[in-house]
């Protein structure tokens, strides 16, 4: 059976998929969404591990529609997974989004036909759906990163990944637990499980740089008392800042400020909680290595004072940083270091010598054996393109996305790809995923997407494809910004980009400049795209 009476197919029911379906449907387009989980929520439906919560500044982690707040009140400054799922249920009630989604089904392939100028999406059960426009909204947190460690299948205890936490997971209370990874999910699970585990061993690839989650109690109370109009104004202002959170960096270079004044400013930003120290610090934090080290040294002094164990102190907060401060998104914490300083918690550095083996009851590393009853992988996800690659997409002439990106990701505006007409991916590689509030990025992308599709319909455009030249131009624009920062000092490389000696660059110019690029494309006659009109294709 093939579902054919569609204008657009959306894959994924997280923030981007929900908003795309809602906005396109409002414009009168016939839209069908597919989601592998049983309900709306995206990563929040899947990430059910203990301690899972939002770490973004309040009130910016929500849909930018204050009307949703007429009968909704946030109960937490940093909403837990449970509250986020209630929020998605509320959105569904107001927008009736589930009516346009089929749940519990995965997409196994997607292919473009030059004959029909339509996409055919194949589902895992063999059914198909066809539409003019194909919109993968799978983000970059959909394919798990699980290290291949010999002996995993022999382990007699429980093995979990934070992004695939089962509803029937055993309690960690009184257990000997191993946590592999100290990224955002690792930081959250260490704080929750560390309080109840009999013993916890943390396997650390690199030290996590963290910031205080909360500022003053008054700050929390004020945030939760915001009215719908207050939210509307905050969200409006957020879209006018580079990071989408309303944070504005101090318009001075670090070393131009006397040291006493500098430290006083650092203290204010540090105590403000959230990402104020990172996003509202001096403007050259991520451009100047000396300025960056100055900020790190202040943070390290404050943080090292919280750790009594000398060995742990050097592992967790080394005097010389492993990488520049802020080029990896800082995690937010409440009592992380106090928990890791406890005698029942052990930290093992695996930066130079990886885990050797998992046995029936233990993990072997550095010639020692760590007995455990549960292993938690807090190892995150694949690279930013892994979600798109997992859909097995084929474009013009049957070209596979994996082959088109064999030497690394290439795109136009971080949304479109040459040889893949009428396909726009949302919140994926080469858009502002690193430094900007995700709902803000998604908001401007979906606004632009709706304008593009509407313009094509009005103009009689049946095929719209990014040019190969636009890839080069976007790469050049990204590089001009990227090379001025410290991000290149710790750039991630996938296996493919490492072989090609290419960095996995992304857009680090922030939201305002990115939005301007999208607007310029529209204003300049769909710059970077080639269009085919109905009359032209009829002659082919």
Swiss-Prot record:
SUPFAM superfamilies assigned: FAD/NAD(P)-binding domain
Binding-site residues, FAD: 43-46, 55-58
Pathway: Alkaloid biosynthesis
EC number: 1.14.13.-
GO BP terms: alkaloid metabolic process
Keyword Oxidoreductase attached: yes
InterPro entries: FAD-binding_Monooxygenases (IPR050775), FAD/NAD-bd_sf (IPR036188), Flavin_mOase-like (IPR020946)
Name of this chain's protein: FAD-binding monooxygenase lolF2
Organism for this UniProt entry: Epichloe uncinata
């Amino acid at each position: 059976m093939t579902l054919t009476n569609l204008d657009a197919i959306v894959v994924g029911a997280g923030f981007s998929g929900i908003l795309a379906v809602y906005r396109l449907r409002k414009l009168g387009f016939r839209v069908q969404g597919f989601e592998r989980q049983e309900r709306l929520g995206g990563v929040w439906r899947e990430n059910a591990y203990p301690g899972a919560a939002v770490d973004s500044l309040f009130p910016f982690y929500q849909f930018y529609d204050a009307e949703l707040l007429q009968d909704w009140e946030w109960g937490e400054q940093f909403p837990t997974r449970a509250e986020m799922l209630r929020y998605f249920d509320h959105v569904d009630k107001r927008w009736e989004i589930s009516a346009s989604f089929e749940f519990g089904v995965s997409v196994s392939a997607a292919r473009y036909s030059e004959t029909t100028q339509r996409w055919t999406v194949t589902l895992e059960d063999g059914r198909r759906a066809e539409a003019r426009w194909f919109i993968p909204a799978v983000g970059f947190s959909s394919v798990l990163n699980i290290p291949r460690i010999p002996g995993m299948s022999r382990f007699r205890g429980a093995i979990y990944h934070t992004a695939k936490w089962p509803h029937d997971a055993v309690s960690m209370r009184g257990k000997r637990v191993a946590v592999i990874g100290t990224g955002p999910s690792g930081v959250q699970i260490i704080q929750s499980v560390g309080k109840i585990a009999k013993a916890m061993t943390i396997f650390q690839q690199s030290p996590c740089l963290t910031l205080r989650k909360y500022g003053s109690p008054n700050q929390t109370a004020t945030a939760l008392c915001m009215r719908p109009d207050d939210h509307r104004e905050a969200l409006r202002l957020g879209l006018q800042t580079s990071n989408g959170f309303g944070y504005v960096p101090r318009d001075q270079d670090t070393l131009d400020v006397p040291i006493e004044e500098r430290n006083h400013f650092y203290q204010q930003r540090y105590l403000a909680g959230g990402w104020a120290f990172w996003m509202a610090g001096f403007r050259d934090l991520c451009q100047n290595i000396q300025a960056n080290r100055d900020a790190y040294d202040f943070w390290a002094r404050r943080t090292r004072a919280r750790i009594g164990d000398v060995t742990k102190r050097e592992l967790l907060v080394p005097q010389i940083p492993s990488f520049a401060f802020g080029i990896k998104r800082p995690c937010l914490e409440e009592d992380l270091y106090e928990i890791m300083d406890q005698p029942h918690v052990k930290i093992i550095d695996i930066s130079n010598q990886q885990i050797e083996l998992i046995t029936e009851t233990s993990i072997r590393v550095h010639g020692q054996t760590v007995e455990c009853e549960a292993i938690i992988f807090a190892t995150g996800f694949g690279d930013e393109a892994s979600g798109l690659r997992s859909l097995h997409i084929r474009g013009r002439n049957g070209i596979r996305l994996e082959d088109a990106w064999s030497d690394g990701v290439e795109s136009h505006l971080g949304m479109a790809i040459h040889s893949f007409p009428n396909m726009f991916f949302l919140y994926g590689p080469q858009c502002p995923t690193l430094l900007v509030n995700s709902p803000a990025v998604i908001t401007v992308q979906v606004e632009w997407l709706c304008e593009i599709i509407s313009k094509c319909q009005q103009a009689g455009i049946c095929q719209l494809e990014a040019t190969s030249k636009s890839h080069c131009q976007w790469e050049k624009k990204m590089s001009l910004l990227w090379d001025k920062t410290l991000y290149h000092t710790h750039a991630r490389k996938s296996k493919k980009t490492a072989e090609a000696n290419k960095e996995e660059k992304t857009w680090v110019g922030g939201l305002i400049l990115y939005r301007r690029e999208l607007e310029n494309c529209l204003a300049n006659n769909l710059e970077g795209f080639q269009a085919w009109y109905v009359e032209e294709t009829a002659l082919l």
